[in-house]
Amino acid sequence: HAGGLRYHGAGVIVSQLLKDNLMEAVDIQQLESFEAGCLFAQAEGIIPAPESCHAIAAAVREAEKCKETGEEKVILFNLSGHGLIDMASYDQYLAGNLMNYELKDEDIQKNLDEIKNM
């Protein structure tokens, strides 16, 4: 999902990379995402777009795994843009007004069933 990028689906290239096991998809909740975005901003001086924060959080997770195991690897992620038009979201995060939200499996299935009937 990349809501701010106005695309709510999986791209063809990403889907093929997943199918070929050349990459993996991970679930990042928004609080972890914004935490990683703030860490990146402090370290690099760039406020990342919220969409990029998910990738940053995944990179941080991977770096922490390497730190624990002693493994050395190159970790690459895509910074899709700056977050200067998303400062209100950062304000909400820093004020403690954001929360993680996850749809229940039943709700997802209900919506998928409704799409099938269109």
Please annotate each region the language model reported.
Residues 58-118:
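Catalytic phosphate/nucleotide-handling subdomain of diverse soluble enzymes
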Residues 5, 9, 32, 54, ...:
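Glycine-rich beta-alpha junction loops
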Residues 28, 49-51, 78-80:
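Generic beta-strand/beta-sheet core signal
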Residues 47-59:
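Substrate-binding/catalytic subdomain of NAD(P)-dependent oxidoreductase enzymes
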Residues 1-46, 92-118:
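Active-site/ligand-binding loops adjacent to catalytic centers
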